[in-house]
Amino acid sequence: MTRPQYILQPVNPYFIAFSLAAAFLLNLLPWGKLPGIPDFVALVLLFWNIHQPRKVGMGIAFCLGLLMDVHNANLLGEHALAYTLLSYGAITIHRRVLWMSLGVQMFAVMPMLVGAQIVPFMVRLLMGAPFPGWGYLVSGFVEAALWPLASIVLLLPQRRPVDPDDTRPI
């Protein structure tokens, strides 16, 4: 038996805003300096850049990056640069990624998510901060592992029920 093909409804802009705000609030939780804590804003931003590149672009990525920099008390622009580059990469390859299965998508977005961790890492090193260790980059791999779950959860409101009605023209 083959998997059903879902026809997605148009995305509600309020749902996009809600999901980005929820991801931002998850990043605000006091996780501490534990390695492997995912950057939820980067994950949700990457998802919407791939699925709705005309609604969520590099401007939103830059603004969210500035908010993350203010929250983390980092050099202003670290996350803004990382999120903008992540958004640019996602918008560039979004058509190819949408044709892949979720498992393959996970490996396709992994370099972008790890790259989004490398940018602030390199900026901090260039500004003279001590080397935080390679565990800092683990969160990019954790985000890639969360990609299938994030895709399923964020697409749920758009899915139409599979209805075996043979009299329907579409």
Protein language model annotation of sequence segments:
Residues 1-170:
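Terminal, non-globular segments
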